[in-house]
Amino acid sequence: MKKRALVSVSNKTGVVEFVKGLLEQGIEVISTGGTKKLLEENGLQVMGISEVTGFPEIMDGRVKTLHPNIHGGLLAVRDNEAHVAEMSELGIQLIDFVVVNLYPFKETIAKPDVTFADAIENIDIGGPTMIRSAAKNHKFVSVIVDPADYDVVLAELKEKGEVTDETKRKLAAKVFRHTAAYDALISNYLTEQMGEESPEILTVTFEKKQDLRYGENPHQKATFYKAPFAVASSVAYAEQLHGKELSYNNINDADAALSIVKEFTEPAVVAVKHMNPCGVGVGTDIHEAYTRAYEADPVSIFGGIIAANREIDKRVAEKLHEIFLEIIIAPSFSKEALEVLQSKKNLRLLTVNIEKTTSASKKLTSVQGGLLVQEEDTLALNEETIIIPTKREPTEQEWNDLKLAWKVVKHVKSNAIVLAKDNMTIGVGAGQMNRVGSAKIAISQAGSKAQGSALASDAFFPMPDTVEEAAKAGITAIIQPGGSIRDEDSIKKADEYGITMVFTGVRHFKH
């Protein structure tokens, strides 16, 4: 009996060549709508779906393949005598290949002017039903949803006269991944349209971007997946201009650097090591900003990741070329800068659209047996709601330093302390189990520069010991959330030493 293939695709890539290959193997082809028209325009003889169903396509094509003559041909168990007899009695013919990809729902909802009606109209019904039927019966049916698999199927047909069982199983698994992702996009879109923030079932879908050499350590396997829609200013959608492939740790560090540099509208440069900032500088131009970021910690920047929010020009590139770096991220690189930096063959150069995130996207964190979901911490300092409980208010220079330190501290692993002075960080204390310990590290790192600097803390002071350490170092201004039952002790201690202190009312833990 002649084998048959049903072909109905929205993504027409390679379909003409593939169907030509099927016809050359003596396979009869059934097709629908626009796919049938394209194939016939290219001189390929195919059968219309109505010839199989005996029923016309109706309701603007909404109903065309939902018919027993189609699904009977797909789902029949061919070594089941009862199934075979039933097919013969009803005049149903077998279908051996299904080549289908689905209505472009993802592409439709990505359009800025999409209407709800347009989105709904691009929810495919017949396509998912067909490929699920075929995938369920993959012992007998080959189902192809990805044009990348066309060559594999044709090669096996030419070499062996059939598609191997292993390939059929792989194709079937891909189908169910395909439909699961498709349904996840639909459910997420409708959930967002209804404004539901915490649905009883969370559906997420990501697409493979690349396999990684290894994970956080060489013995760990790892893969990088990207969100289905382009996320402004993200590593997942950055363009790599030069250098080795990104590693797992590179991606984490680059993401951290991007998150920090997006805090600034003025020219800024951020240096990151192990997802913590080791130097942040701002200036009137990107060269001044880089100089400050470098001077913030010229030791830790070695082997680090640099993110800038302005184009890298030749002058800055020549300075960057002097030290070993893993990655440089910027909105763009001048031609002359690229010539300088590309002389280092392993240095990764990424371009990305640096944009401040205006709405809180969801952050997913895996735990054993579950997943934590929260909004990203994008809350900026609100100068209208701050409280200054001390006798002295910040000077203009202190206020500038406080704001810089506050922007940075929320990106430092808790317990976090950041010292800033003259448009740059001068000390970062990260990840200590007690707050005063982080303060001591930041102060030690700053050395004599701590005199006259500003200190930011990601959470309140449980006791006044951090204020005492700040006073010893000559720090003159502090910014912190406030809210401790011992706030009054810290306020009194600050007043005792003439330190101005700002309460933001906002905590910025980062774990």
Curated annotation (Swiss-Prot):
From which domain of life does this come? Bacteria
Task: Tell me yes or no: is Transit peptide among this UniProt entry's keywords.
Answer: no
Which segments constitute the MGS-like domain? 1-145
Q: Where are the transmembrane segments?
A: none
User: Which keywords appear in this protein's UniProt record, sorted alphabetically?
Assistant: Hydrolase, Multifunctional enzyme, Purine biosynthesis, Transferase
Report the InterPro entries cross-referenced here. Answer: AICAR_Tfase_dup_dom_sf (IPR024051), Cytidine_deaminase-like (IPR016193), MGS-like_dom (IPR011607), MGS-like_dom_sf (IPR036914), PurH-like (IPR002695)
Q: Spell out the reaction equation it catalyses.
A: (6R)-10-formyltetrahydrofolate + 5-amino-1-(5-phospho-beta-D-ribosyl)imidazole-4-carboxamide = 5-formamido-1-(5-phospho-D-ribosyl)imidazole-4-carboxamide + (6S)-5,6,7,8-tetrahydrofolate; IMP + H2O = 5-formamido-1-(5-phospho-D-ribosyl)imidazole-4-carboxamide
Question: What's any GO biological process attached to this entry?
Answer: 'de novo' IMP biosynthetic process
In the UniProt record, does the keyword Cell cycle occur? Answer: no
CC annotations in GO: cytosol
What are the disulfide bonds?
none
State the SMART domains in the record.
AICARFT_IMPCHas, MGS
Instruction: Write out the GO MF terms.
Output: IMP cyclohydrolase activity; phosphoribosylaminoimidazolecarboxamide formyltransferase activity
Question: Where does this protein act, in terms of pathway?
Answer: Purine metabolism; IMP biosynthesis via de novo pathway; 5-formamido-1-(5-phospho-D-ribosyl)imidazole-4-carboxamide from 5-amino-1-(5-phospho-D-ribosyl)imidazole-4-carboxamide (10-formyl THF route): step 1/1; Purine metabolism; IMP biosynthesis via de novo pathway; IMP from 5-formamido-1-(5-phospho-D-ribosyl)imidazole-4-carboxamide: step 1/1
- EC? 2.1.2.3, 3.5.4.10
Written domain comment of the UniProt record: The IMP cyclohydrolase activity resides in the N-terminal region.
What protein family does this chain belong to? Belongs to the PurH family.
Protein name as it appears in the record: Bifunctional purine biosynthesis protein PurH
Organism of origin is Bacillus cytotoxicus (strain DSM 22905 / CIP 110041 / 391-98 / NVH 391-98)
Lineage from the top down?
A: Bacteria, Bacillati, Bacillota, Bacilli, Bacillales
What's the encoding gene here?
A: purH
